[in-house]
Regions:
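His/Glu-based metal-binding/catalytic segments typifying zinc-dependent metallopeptidases
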Residues: 145-204, 309
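Charge-rich, well-structured scaffold segments of protease-associated domains
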Residues: 1-146, 171, 177-179, 209-351
Length: 351
């Protein structure tokens, strides 16, 4: 109610590598609202009654997610890609872990949170950073060295399946790659653009335009502090599953053996640049991106220089990066048992 009276918004997001809190308001009201961040960061403010409600809500969200075969297939491939690494777990948790959390654990978490590195960005020059303890306000010169990926060269357990009664087959194929602050990540972003950006993308042309096979297709390549996953996903009907799967493996093989043509490379670069402009248009998006970069130990003005790096990358570079990270993929399937067994046979013959 306090925020609504000033027409302000407070947004919170938790992800694999951190937590983001965003406060938006008119400049004239910011001084009155800014102390809320102090309360959120420094003082336990969740009453036990509210904790119980939040715990039930978290459980409901997890239970709903378990009903979605796409989520199950996605979570399964993370389990075999990362094993006991934090990236193998769902940010929303699971039923067992949520039920084990007690109110005292939340109070202890506040103490842990106060010790973590925090970064604050605002466009309000009158903001007094000293109100917040342990906030690094002037961090633009703080950069970590490039994190080298600690890759699993070949995962012996590269296949996982989930049986469902659905007539839809869901497929995820992918590998661990590099952290976001690696120079290799730009080549992988170009590859993502080539595969999945728009109606000119390879996945759309092969699976939808030419063959009319898939309900959905795309690439998942997120920003991560450590090894990010590079995943291609598809959903397809049972009758088209084998043909679609063979096409997918053929595309994956081409990524490891063929260079992009000059036209393909130019178009992929152009789409990537335009995507970046589209994603970082609003003040909120730009600020969140800079805070995210700081949290990853990167230059908050990294994006200013990215276009020059994109322009320098050649098809040969992308092929070499593909060979470096995508040679030993893992696969996750969801569908009826017999269809999964048929696809598993195709997979075992290839990998």
């Amino acid at each position: 109610d306090f925020l609504d009276n000033y027409g302000a918004e407070l947004n919170f997001e938790a992800f694999e590598d951190g937590i983001s809190i965003c406060l938006k308001s008119l400049s004239e009201y910011f001084d009155r609202l800014f102390p809320l961040l102090t309360l959120l960061i420094e003082e336990p403010n969740l009453f036990e009654k509210e904790f119980t409600y939040c715990q039930k809500e978290a459980l409901n969200n997890v239970i709903k997610a378990k009903e979605n075969s796409f989520n199950i297939t996605f979570n399964n491939i993370k389990k075999i890609l990362y094993k006991e690494h934090p990236y193998s777990f769902n940010c929303n948790g699971d039923e067992e872990s949520i039920n084990l959390i007690k109110y005292d654990d939340i109070l202890k978490e506040y103490q842990s949170f106060r010790k973590r590195k925090k970064y604050l960005l605002t466009n309000n020059s009158k903001c007094k950073f000293s109100k917040l303890k342990d906030i690094e306000a002037c961090v633009f010169d703080k950069k970590e060295g490039e994190i080298q990926p600690n890759l699993i060269i070949k995962n012996k357990n590269n296949y996982i399946e989930h049986y469902s009664n659905s007539k839809q087959i869901i497929i995820f194929i992918g590998s661990q790659t590099c952290p976001h602050n690696s120079k290799d990540s730009i080549s992988l972003k170009i590859l993502e653009s080539y595969l999945s950006y728009g109606m000119s993308s390879l996945l759309f042309k092969v699976f939808r335009e030419k063959n009319g096979l898939t309900y959905d297709s795309g690439v998942f390549y997120p920003v991560r502090k450590f090894n990010a996953p590079f995943l291609i996903y598809l959903s397809v009907s049972e009758k088209n599953a084998s043909f679609t799967f063979s096409l997918l493996l053929s595309i994956w093989n081409d990524l490891l053996s063929k260079e992009l043509t000059n036209n393909e490379l130019s178009l992929a670069k152009l789409k990537l640049k335009r995507s970046r402009l589209h994603n970082y248009r609003s003040l909120e998006e730009i600020t969140f991106r800079k805070v995210r970069l700081l949290g990853l130990g990167m230059d908050p003005f990294y994006d200013v220089h990215v276009e020059n790096h994109i322009n320098k990358i050649k098809s040969e570079d992308i092929l070499n990066i593909s060979k470096k990270y995508l040679t030993y993929p893992c696969i996750s399937l969801s569908g009826r048992k017999q269809i999964c067994k048929d696809l598993k046979e195709i997979w075992r013959n290839k990998y």
